[in-house]
Amino acid sequence: MPKTRRRPRRSQRKRPPTPWPTSQGLDRVFFSDTQSTCLETVYKATGAPSLGDYVRPAYIVTPYWPPVQSIRSPGTPSMDALSAQLYSSLSLDSPPSPPREPLRPLRSLPRQSLIQPPTFHPPSSRPCANTPPSEMDTWNPPLGSTSQPCLFQTPDSGPKTCTPSGEAPLSACTSTSFPPPSPGPSCPM
């Protein structure tokens, strides 16, 4: 009995490798996804009793793939029609012309905004030119309130919350590293 079990193993080692992946639990391989040309049993992968059942890999013909027209359902268009429709929708003549008209004023607007800031920055930077940005910045409250001006220190000395006499601390007087919001245009730092 052990001799008969060893003979198929020796014959499997002499066989050429199979062109498809084999597993121990796989008994037969079927080409079930193709049409009737390859629906027959190709090879018994494990434990073939003799070489007579083995089909040589050279004998296996490549499967016959059906033409594209037979796979396509009757309602769907062909690939040529789909590609022509896609090409017509992506053509370079008609679609870019409507966006070009609104883009021309949009392209000129950033140019005007880039030209305008140098005319507005010098008046707003004149009060900040007297004191360097590393020194203490002074913020004056609006004219309606009678509280004292808040002094803001640099970020090196830490945040400072000013509390005028007899008043609760204001949220606008708390600063960490940013200058307070001013009603006018901000100074460039």
Swiss-Prot record:
Modified residues (Phosphoserine): S70, S177
Entry's induction text: Down-regulated by P30II.
Residue span of motif Nuclear localization signal, and RNA-binding (RxRE): 2-18
Residues found modified as Phosphothreonine: T174
Extent of Low complexity compositional bias: 105-114
Subunit composition and interactions: Homomultimer. Multimeric assembly is essential for activity and involves XPO1. Binds to human XPO1 and KPNB1. Interacts (via N-terminal nuclear localization signal) with human NPM1.
Protein name: Protein Rex
Description of post-translational modifications: Phosphorylated.
Keyword annotations: Host cytoplasm, Host nucleus, Host-virus interaction, mRNA transport, Phosphoprotein, RNA-binding, Transport
Biased amino acid composition, Pro residues: 178-189
